[in-house]
């Protein structure tokens, strides 16, 4: 586990080596804004297709399901063929799907293309992130991931505002055109800047793939650390999926007011990532998680207070979500690193396993809470957010403490 990280060859973080992560984050931005730009427009899209607004969250959940569907293949495939080939092919496929969705005329066809576009999430998480972790030393990799998160977070900051513009002034179709062009620009940067070396993996029959996944999923430490990721990320994912319905459909905010309401929420995430970059070298790795999760729990309690005292609902929603996002910002990159390095299996396979658990959990929980929301409205959202963060304080917290203790013991030797 921890000792394995000392055997991985890495490159120093400098202006030259930073160009690859910057090219990758351009694609990450395209993939994320593929959700954050489109999700606010989903009320208009469902109206165009003549279906209920309750279909709106399904655009995001099918996007995430697409991300989970091929992670099992992309990670191991990149172990064999090299990260660069698989990543470049994935970028082109994503751009093609963005163009094809322009031809859809029914919500079912639209969701099918959203599912296929979601494969871009796996390209990022199972291939791109694995390449970052392998190319940089541990703390540098976490800094790069946090820096990438800050740049990609322009997507949820700009997405709602641009989505409001699409709804009010032009067709939603143009959003997909812009996303496709952005992905193609990223492809050019990755082709030029991404290191082309591949990890040395013994060529084995593809049946070994299932043995590798069995090793990964039978690792209790891996499961404990990885299951923390959807728990920590779920409140924000639910907010992104449901906030158009909460703020616009239920609370009657305008599309512009909806866009502006997202700024403090995602600013909290950006500030959290900046704080992580600043303090990570001063603290034991994992300490920021132990700080961040109580902050997130406090945020969920404020959400509940807002539903109890309706006069303060909108301020409580925004303050609570801002605290949740700040806590996630100082926690998530560290948790991801711990999960990825908790197994001896090749990193492409481990990254794929992480991606599958993460995306499948997101899909299932968003669809479940979407249904609960039709029955219980805001209570479904706020109590779900509280439950997910509270669950982290069970087995995932113990797994984190064990990992931190193991690292201390390794450093002493």
From Swiss-Prot:
Q: Which keywords accompany this UniProt record?
A: Antibiotic resistance, Cell inner membrane, Cell membrane, Membrane, Transmembrane, Transmembrane helix, Transport
A GO biological-process term? response to antibiotic
* Mode of membrane association: Multi-pass membrane protein
User: Could you cite one Gene Ontology molecular function of this protein?
Assistant: transmembrane transporter activity
In terms of superkingdom, the source organism counts as: Bacteria
Spans traversing the lipid bilayer: 18-38, 55-75, 84-104, 110-130, 147-167, 170-190, 228-248, 260-280, 289-309, 312-332, 349-369, 373-393
Pfam families noted in UniProt: MFS_1
**Gene Ontology CC:** plasma membrane
Keyword Cell inner membrane on entry: yes
Where does it reside? Cell inner membrane
Q: Which SUPFAM superfamilies does this UniProt record tie to the protein?
A: MFS general substrate transporter
**Family under the similarity heading:** Belongs to the major facilitator superfamily.
Q: What name goes with this protein? A: Chloramphenicol resistance protein CraA
Q: Which organism is it from?
A: Acinetobacter baumannii (strain ATCC 19606 / DSM 30007 / JCM 6841 / CCUG 19606 / CIP 70.34 / NBRC 109757 / NCIMB 12457 / NCTC 12156 / 81)
* Gene from which this protein is expressed: craA
């Amino acid at each position: 586990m921890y000792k394995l990280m000392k055997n991985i060859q890495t490159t120093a973080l400098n202006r030259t080596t930073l160009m690859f992560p910057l090219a990758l984050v351009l694609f990450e931005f395209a993939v994320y804004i593929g959700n954050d730009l489109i999700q606010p427009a989903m009320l208009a899209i469902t109206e165009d297709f003549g279906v209920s607004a309750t279909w709106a969250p399904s655009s995001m959940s099918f996007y995430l399901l697409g991300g989970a569907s091929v992670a099992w293949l992309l990670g191991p495939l990149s172990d064999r063929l090299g990260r660069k080939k698989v990543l470049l092919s994935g970028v082109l496929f994503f751009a093609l799907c963005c163009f094809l969705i322009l031809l859809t005329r029914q919500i079912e066809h639209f969701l099918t293309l959203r599912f296929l576009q979601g494969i871009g999430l796996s390209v990022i998480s199972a291939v791109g992130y694995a390449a970052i972790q392998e190319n940089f030393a541990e703390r540098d990799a976490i800094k790069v991931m946090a820096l990438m998160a800050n740049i990609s977070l322009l997507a949820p900051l700009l997405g709602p505002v641009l989505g409001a513009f699409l709804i009010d002034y032009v067709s939603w179709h143009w959003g997909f055109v812009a996303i496709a062009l952005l992905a193609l620009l990223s492809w050019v940067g990755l082709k030029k800047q991404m290191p082309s070396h591949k990890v040395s993996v013994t060529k084995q029959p593809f049946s070994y793939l299932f043995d590798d996944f069995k090793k990964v999923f039978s690792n209790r430490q891996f499961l404990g650390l990885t299951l923390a990721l959807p728990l920590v990320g779920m409140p924000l994912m639910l907010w992104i999926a449901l906030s158009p319905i909460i703020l616009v459909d239920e609370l009657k905010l305008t599309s512009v007011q909806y866009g502006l309401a997202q700024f403090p929420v995602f600013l909290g995430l950006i500030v959290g990532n900046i704080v992580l970059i600043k303090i990570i070298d001063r603290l034991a790795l994992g300490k920021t998680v132990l700080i961040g999760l109580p902050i997130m729990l406090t945020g969920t309690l404020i959400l509940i207070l807002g539903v109890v005292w309706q006069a303060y609902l909108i301020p409580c929603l925004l303050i609570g979500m801002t605290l949740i996002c700040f806590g996630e910002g100082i926690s998530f990159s560290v948790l991801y690193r711990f999960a990825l390095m908790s197994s001896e299996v090749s990193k492409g396979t481990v990254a794929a396993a992480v991606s599958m658990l993460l995306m499948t959990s997101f899909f299932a929980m968003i669809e479940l809470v979407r249904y609960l929301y039709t029955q219980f409205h805001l209570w479904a959202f706020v109590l779900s957010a509280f439950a997910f963060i509270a669950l982290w304080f069970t087995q995932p917290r113990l797994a984190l403490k064990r990992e931190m203790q193991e690292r201390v013991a390794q450093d002493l030797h």
